[in-house]
């Protein structure tokens, strides 16, 4: 098997919040899902947990109904694709399974137990994707029998809504495993990115730095928590939903980041010193758009068309958030006095109310 289109049935090991969100993402896209409650429970507790998990998924679907994204019938159809079972009932289906997303608690012993159990009951061709945000794929591959069939697939919460899934592979991961998982994720509307086995993947690593810096600013009295969050929502966050971080370095010019970083390092802390690659780009003239090379190569790019596209995306985003600049009439009277200095124009400007911003 080589094409993700062949995958029609997804198993998810671990029925907590992340497992429920992933189950909803696949069921919403039309796939059958078996959500496995892996924790040992007595019959009453097992039944209660399954009911609670099902109730939470239904609540998420009802939210989409309220927002007008789906109908009641579509919500019911989505829910009908999800079966919640305990580990005993899951065994038979796993033997004929296609892919398992592991979503048990972030404890290595729990991961080891889960993969040992999967090794006993999953079929020979089943692919494994751990949703861990903590352990490297290289660490998990040490506890599985077939490391070539394992990779990490890190979803962001809420999993059924956030498009990004960070796929982390190692040299031991088979190329076909990566291709099939990436194709499957794209098929259900996700946006997979592939990264090396590195602590924090991409988003959590950048996010941790940004969140800690925001916390430090509160600590230092730079601004209130509310104003910092407003700045992020209406500035930083808006900008980087259209432009990537590295794309923005090229957009403004590497020199801006380079000199700003040195200033902040002197004024605040050496942690702000630029990355070595930023210094290298400065030295080698890879300054971004202005000389057609930076983190990206713009030699064959129609730069005016590219800029127009990005600005259009940004304008539409501002419109959708109610943050677009407000245009109101400005009356301008122009008079030229006979006694005035030649070519001197006197402007009288009265500005109307510009409205809320």
What kind of feature is each model-predicted range?
Residues 1-60:
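NAD(P)+-binding Rossmann beta1-loop-alpha1 motif at the extreme N-terminus of oxidoreductases
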Residues 2-6, 190-197, 220, 225-337, ...:
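NAD(P)-dependent Rossmann-like dehydrogenase/reductase catalytic/cofactor-binding core
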Residues 6-9, 97, 125:
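Phosphate-coordination loops involved in phosphoryl transfer and adenosine-cofactor binding
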Residues 31-32, 146, 165-198, 210-238:
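Internal alpha-helical scaffold of NAD(P)-dependent oxidoreductase catalytic cores
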Residues 34-36, 83-85, 101, 129, ...:
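Hydrophobic/aromatic beta-strand patches that form the interior of the parallel beta-sheet core
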Residues 38-97:
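Conserved N-terminal Rossmann-fold NAD(P) cofactor-binding segment
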Residues 99, 104-165:
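Rossmann-like NAD(P)(H) cofactor-binding subdomain of soluble oxidoreductases
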């Amino acid at each position: 098997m080589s094409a993700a289109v062949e995958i029609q049935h997804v198993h998810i090991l671990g029925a907590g919040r992340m497992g429920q969100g992933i189950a909803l993402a696949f069921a919403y896209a039309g796939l059958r899902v078996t959500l496995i409650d892996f924790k040992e429970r007595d019959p009453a507790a097992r039944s209660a947990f399954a009911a609670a998990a099902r109730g939470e998924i239904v609540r998420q679907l009802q939210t989409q109904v309220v927002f007008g994204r789906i109908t009641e019938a579509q919500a019911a159809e989505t829910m009908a694709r999800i079966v919640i079972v305990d580990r005993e009932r899951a065994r038979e289906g796993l033997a004929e399974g296609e892919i398992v997303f592991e979503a048990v608690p972030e404890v290595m012993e729990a991961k080891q137990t889960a993969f040992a159990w999967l090794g006993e009951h999953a079929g020979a061709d089943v692919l494994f994707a751990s949703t861990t945000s903590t352990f490297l794929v290289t660490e998990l591959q040490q506890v599985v029998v077939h490391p070539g069939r394992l990779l990490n697939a890190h979803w962001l919460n809420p999993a059924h809504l956030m498009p990004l899934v960070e796929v982390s592979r190692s040299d031991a991961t088979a190329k076909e495993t990566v291709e099939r998982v990436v194709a499957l994720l794209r098929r259900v509307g996700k946006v997979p990115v592939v990264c090396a086995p590195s602590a924090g993947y991409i988003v959590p690593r950048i996010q941790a730095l940004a969140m800690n810096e925001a916390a430090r600013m509160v600590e230092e009295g730079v601004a209130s928590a509310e104003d910092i969050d407003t700045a992020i929502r209406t500035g930083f966050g808006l900008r980087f939903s259209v432009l990537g971080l590295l794309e923005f370095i090229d957009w403004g010019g590497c020199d801006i980041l380079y000199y700003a970083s040195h200033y902040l390092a002197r004024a605040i802390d050496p942690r702000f010193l630029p990355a070595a690659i930023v210094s290298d780009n400065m030295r080698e003239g890879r300054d971004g758009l202005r000389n057609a090379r930076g983190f990206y190569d713009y030699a064959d790019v129609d730069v005016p068309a590219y800029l127009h596209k990005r600005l259009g995306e940004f304008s539409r985003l501002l419109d959708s958030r109610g943050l677009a600049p407000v245009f109101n009439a400005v009356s301008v009277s122009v008079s030229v006095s006979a006694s005035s200095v030649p070519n001197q124009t006197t402007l009288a400007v009265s500005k109307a109310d510009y409205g809320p911003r």
